Each structure stands twice: as structure tokens, then as C-alpha cells.
Swiss-Prot record:
GO CC annotation, single: nucleus
Task of the protein: Oxidoreductase; part of the gene cluster that mediates the biosynthesis of campesine G, a dimeric indole piperazine alkaloid that shows good insecticidal activity Galleria mellonella. Within the pathway, cpsB reduces the unstable (S,S)-trypyl-valyl dihydropiperazine (didehydrocampesine A) intermediate to (S, S)-trypyl-valyl-piperazine (campesine A) using two equivalents of NAD(P)H. The non-canonical non-ribosomal peptide synthetase cpsA catalyzes the first steps of the pathway by producing L-tryptophanal and L-valinal from their respective amino-acids.
Reactions performed catalytically: didehydrocampesine A + 2 AH2 = campesine A + 2 A
Protein name in UniProt: NmrA-like family domain-containing oxidoreductase cpsB
Chain's gene name: cpsB
An individual GO BP term: alkaloid metabolic process
Cited Gene3D superfamilies: NAD(P)-binding Rossmann-like Domain (3.40.50.720), UDP-galactose 4-epimerase, domain 1 (3.90.25.10)
Organism: Aspergillus campestris (strain IBT 28561)
Amino acid sequence: MTIPSASKTLVTVYGATGSQGGSVARSLLQNTEFAVRAITRNASSTSAQNLKALGAEVVQADGWNKSQVQEAFSGSWAAFVNTNSEDPMFMSDDGPTEFDLGKIIIDGIVESGSVEHLVYSSAVSTSAFTQGEVTAKAAEMKSRVEKYAMATGYFKSVCPVYAGWYMELFNNTDFARVFGGFPKFPDAEGYLTLSTPRWGAKTDMPVPWVAVEKDFGDIVHGVLLAPERYHGKVIPALSDASSFPQVVDAFQSATGKNVRYVRQAKWDMFGAGIPELEDQRRLFHFGELTNGKYFGDEPTSTTVPAYLKAQAAKAKNKGVDDEAELLTLNQWFRSGFRQ
């Protein structure tokens, strides 16, 4: 490990009560080498108090207030930052952007004067990889913040982590309706039907799926054990790589339920008529044009995250299989959908 060992090393998590940040905080709190500071907009929330009970220092700060950000990160050795792309304020074309927020946070971290390593939840530049043909707003904003952080020249390492599709999406009833009913609502013929455009150009390419609660935090934890090794390198955060037809196979194997996959003819059919899903439609278009290059030039493979997960398990002194190995879709479906 490259982290100092004289005393606990402070890692501050921005967005600590969100799904990504919470997973990171909980993982790091199991490593006696680390102290965790959790930044939240509401320190009295249940999620914040749960982190406090686990041993985190909880501080309240507004990401739009640079002086508050600066104070919140003061004394930290490393930072994990994720901003909420789905915040309603970012939906307007003439309102503030996620880049605006990210820039303030990066500036505040730099001015805190102590943070050496930044792990930033980023995404591929859809515009760059399609020569401007597709621009998925959320991915583009995150990519711009990543580049801005790198351009400051301040950090010893900037480690961009690209999160795959959340397995937890399948728990969301609204998304189930968009997905064709899968995995919650049988259709008129009694099937749980998963319906999406193709991910890929002419064949079904693997989609990166991440178990956010169980795996994402450990992947980031693994990065923070040797952050300079990952400076400027895309870190694919996924637990399983399975095409949409393979998702159906995994669910059927795990539950024995009647299930099928129905491919939508065009990328723009996904969630048609729902403005909030425009970015997801553009992402399918991106997948078609790039043949499923979700992570850009980094392959959709579990090799890197599996290594990072195993390293985190060692650091937590938890070498048992369910702590050291990534969760497969089959395992995830078995844990939540088998009757």
C-alpha cells in the first residue's frame, strides 16, 4: 500500500449519502488505515446518521459554496466525488450545469491545500467518440469535470471511475415499465419481458452492470490503496458484463420465471415520450455507433474491478469469497427475486 501508515489517513467523500458515495464510505470504514469524512447537504438525515454510527465524521456542506467545500475537504489526503446527474436543476438547457457544480467542487478541493488524490465518478465523452454525432449530456458534463481536474495540475493522481449500469435499476418500478415490465410486471402473455434497443452495432454487445451497494465502494477502495497507479486511467466499475439477452438468461436461471427479451427496432424507441430519458436514448445511439464502447477505449471486462475488489477485501481482512469476488447478475437476481 502507498498510503501513509503513521495514523489514520483521511478520505473525504462528496455525495456520501448517495448510492455511490455511501458504498465508498462503508467500504473504507472497514479498513482501519482509513478515516472517513462524509459530506452531505443534510447532516441530520437517516443516511448521514447511519454513516456516523459506522464511524464516519459527518459534515454538512453545499457543493455550490466553494468556501464550504474548501473547509469540508481540509486536512484530507484523498477525495471521492460524485455529483447527481439527475438533479432536476440540470434538466434545463439554460440553467446551471453539472460541470458548473463540478468545477466549484474541484476548485474548493484544490484550495483546501491538502488533497493529493482525487477519485472522480466520471463517464466517457460521447461526443468525442462519435465525432460530435451523439452528445449525452450527463456523460459529457462528467467528462468535462474530469478533464478540468486533470488540467489543474494540482493532484498527484486523478483517477476517473466510470460506473456501469446499476443492477439496482431492476428494483425500480418506473424503470421496470420502461424496460417492458421486466422484472416486476408480467405482460398479457404471462412473460416478464425485457425490451430495449440493441446495445452494439450489429450484434448484442456486453453491457457493464455494477452492484453499487456491494461492489462499487470496494472498487474505489482498491484504487485508493495505490492511487498513483491509476492516474489518468479509466477504471471500469462493473460487476458483470452481460448483453441484454444474457440478462434475461441470468434471471431465468436464478428464478425459474417465464421471461423473454424483445429487441426494440431503434435506439430512440427507449422510453419514447419521456423527456427525462433523453440521455438514455442518446446512450443507446452511442452504443450503436461505437459497437458498445461504454468505457471508450477501455474494454468492457471485469478484470480490473475484480482485482480492485480483491485488494479491498485483503485490506479489510475479509478474504472470504462473498467479500473478495464481484457479484454476478445471477447471484444478484437470486438474492432479490427468487421466491
